[in-house]
């Protein structure tokens, strides 16, 4: 491809609304173009990388015994009502009506459609197992699209669904997909982690996320350096600090003028934060909830949402707190009525806590769960963090940032039961099909590759997913010798099947080098009068600072050998 014919332009300035590195570099390199919030066009360079990622995915899916199909994006809302997932997805679903006033949605995922197909085409144990996948656009009305391709409203996704006759069959499908996903990321040249995850609105009994490690990732990965445990922070469990049990003391009200934050109250009363209780207020499907936790811990809203089994959970606004009769900054469950109280199990681990007196400017000393208040629900609703104790060994948690690029779920039978997707066994007994689902974000994978592979100058593409393998930088192309040499190398490489972007533009060396670094093509060949006078071509890998002069008569062989070694991942 000649750069002079390439559709798209690079830009020097960092777009003001681009927060993540990948968003900045995708826009600056001209690889994507925004149409509206969370909706992007893939320009030719990015689309070449997308196609390479899709091809790697297809190869690994096919190797794992999967069959590719295509399902409709347009779905009747009735199948979402039948599955019971219309409410959990909530406003994320794009709703529309056709000319006959029928309610439809744009598919955010395809569990409903594939289960409907399974109910029609799988009848016997002889029809099992089945593994079916597609690579297709999905639509989700994200409230805050951000991060370029990280969180968008239209995105490309590979979704695969497994159908098995037994839990052991599901385990086999699940493990096969786990290994296939790891192979995809390895072949794309990326470092990934597999971590425990929350199933969210998809549902199911178990799930794992695949994270591409990147400093600017939107997810927090909690892991133990001493053992193999790793989880998304929203799912992670940890060993909470044990407090000594004391003889219960009488409640005592004390004045705490102007002290509202836990740290301020603890300092004012000369106690440790772990000896206090804090209250956080939420609205769960429109109902006011007080969550109570030890002062040295924070609420994990995903755990709280799962415990409450609600579709919508958010922090209560000031007006809602006042309407509930709660005094923010001095609140506790002591003496409150007609309010749902949810407590973290840490409140049972300790005694004689400091908590709010439900009066502005006052707190209570010697508050004890069971004696002074009772929780309507009690469970682990605490957020794990760096420094938390590992529950599986004596290690201490560390943390990394990451970008989620894949999520796999053991769905079980809850969808097949709702759709009547049953099979008969060898004895003629009917059973619901056991399902799994496996998603992989293709556009996210592209963005995550950049988050993990870049420097201050631009993108550094791994060879397997680079839009082009070689960037030929021709300098002073008005010189006939330079032009002839550049054209000859370009033609020879293309004849060998090498993917080449030939910068044939009449621009300065500085502009060309800047664009080469920004676009991040893995291998750059610079052909100039000075290099040719020395009998060679400047050969430089994008990830290296050093370059070398390679003789003209061996440059093609050197390029082929380098591409092979860089692609064998």
Curated annotation (Swiss-Prot):
Q: Which GO terms describe its biological process?
A: prolyl-tRNA aminoacylation
Keyword terms: Aminoacyl-tRNA synthetase, ATP-binding, Cytoplasm, Ligase, Nucleotide-binding, Protein biosynthesis
**InterPro entries per the UniProt record, alphabetical:** aa-tRNA-synt_IIb, aa-tRNA-synth_II, aa-tRNA-synth_II/BPL/LPL, Anticodon-bd, Anticodon-bd_dom_sf, Pro-tRNA-ligase_IIa, Pro-tRNA-synth_IIa_bac-type, Pro-tRNA-Synthase_IIa_type1
Q: What is the reaction catalyzed?
A: tRNA(Pro) + L-proline + ATP = L-prolyl-tRNA(Pro) + AMP + diphosphate
Organism domain of life = Bacteria
Q: Which GO terms describe its molecular function?
A: aminoacyl-tRNA deacylase activity; ATP binding; proline-tRNA ligase activity
Q: Which residues form the signal peptide?
A: none
Q: HAMAP family annotated for this entry?
A: Pro_tRNA_synth_type1
Q: What is this protein called?
A: Proline--tRNA ligase
What gene does this protein come from? proS
């Amino acid at each position: 491809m000649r750069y002079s014919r390439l559709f798209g332009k690079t830009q020097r300035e960092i777009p003001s609304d681009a927060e993540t590195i990948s968003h900045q570099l995708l826009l600056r390199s001209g690889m994507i173009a925004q149409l509206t919030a969370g909706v992007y066009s893939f320009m030719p360079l990015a689309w070449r990388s997308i196609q390479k990622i899709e091809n790697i995915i297809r190869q690994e899916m096919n190797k794992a015994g999967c069959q590719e199909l295509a399902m409709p994006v347009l779905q009747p809302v009735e199948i979402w009502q039948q599955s019971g997932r219309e409410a959990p997805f909530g406003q994320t679903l794009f709703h529309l009506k056709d000319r006959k006033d029928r309610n439809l949605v744009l598919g955010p995922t395809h569990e409903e459609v594939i289960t409907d197909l399974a109910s029609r085409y799988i009848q016997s144990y002889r029809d099992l197992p089945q593994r079916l996948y597609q690579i297709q656009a999905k639509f989700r009305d994200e409230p805050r699209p951000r991060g370029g391709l990280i969180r968008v409203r239209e995105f490309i996704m590979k979704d695969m669904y497994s159908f098995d006759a037994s839990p052991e069959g599901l385990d086999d499908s699940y493990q096969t997909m786990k290994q296939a996903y790891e192979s995809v990321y390895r072949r794309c040249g990326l470092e990934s982690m597999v971590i425990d995850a929350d199933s969210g609105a998809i549902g199911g009994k178990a799930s794992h996320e695949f994270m591409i490690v990147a400093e600017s990732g939107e997810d927090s990965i909690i892991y133990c350096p001493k053992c193999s445990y790793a989880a998304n922070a929203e799912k992670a469990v940890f060993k909470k600090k044990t407090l000594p049990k004391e003889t219960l003391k009488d409640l005592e009200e004390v004045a705490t003028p102007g002290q509202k934050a836990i740290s301020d109250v603890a300092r004012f009363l000369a106690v440790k934060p772990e000896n206090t209780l804090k209250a956080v207020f939420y609205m769960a499907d429109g109902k006011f909830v007080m969550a109570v936790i030890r002062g040295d811990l924070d609420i994990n809203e995903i755990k709280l949402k799962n415990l409450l089994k609600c579709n919508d959970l958010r922090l209560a606004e000031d007006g809602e707190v006042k309407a509930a009769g709660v005094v923010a900054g001095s609140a506790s469950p002591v003496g409150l009525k007609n309010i749902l109280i949810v407590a973290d199990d840490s409140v049972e681990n300790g005694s004689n806590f400091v908590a709010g007196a439900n009066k502005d400017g006052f707190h209570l000393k010697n508050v004890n769960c069971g004696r002074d208040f009772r929780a309507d629900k009690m469970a682990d609703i605490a957020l794990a963090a760096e420094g938390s104790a590992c529950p599986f060994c004596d290690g201490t948690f560390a943390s990394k940032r990451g970008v989620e690029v894949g999520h796999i779920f053991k769905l079980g039978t809850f969808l097949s039961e709702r759709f009547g997707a049953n099979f008969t066994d060898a004895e003629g007994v009917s059973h619901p099909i056991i399902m799994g689902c496996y998603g992989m974000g293709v556009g996210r994978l592209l963005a995550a590759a950049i988050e993990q592979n870049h420097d201050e100058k631009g993108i550094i593409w791994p060879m397997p997913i680079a839009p082009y393998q070689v960037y030929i930088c021709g300098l002073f192309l008005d010189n006939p010798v330079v032009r002839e040499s550049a054209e000859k190398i370009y033609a020879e490489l293309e004849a060998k099947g090498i993917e080449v972007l030939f910068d044939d533009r009449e621009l300065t060396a500085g502009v060309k080098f800047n664009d080469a670094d920004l676009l991040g093509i893995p291998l750059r060949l610079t052909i100039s009068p000075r290099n040719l006078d020395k009998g060679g071509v400047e050969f430089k890998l994008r990830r290296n600072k050093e370059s070398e002069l390679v003789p003209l008569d061996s440059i093609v062989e050197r390029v082929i050998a380098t591409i092979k070694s860089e692609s064998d991942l």
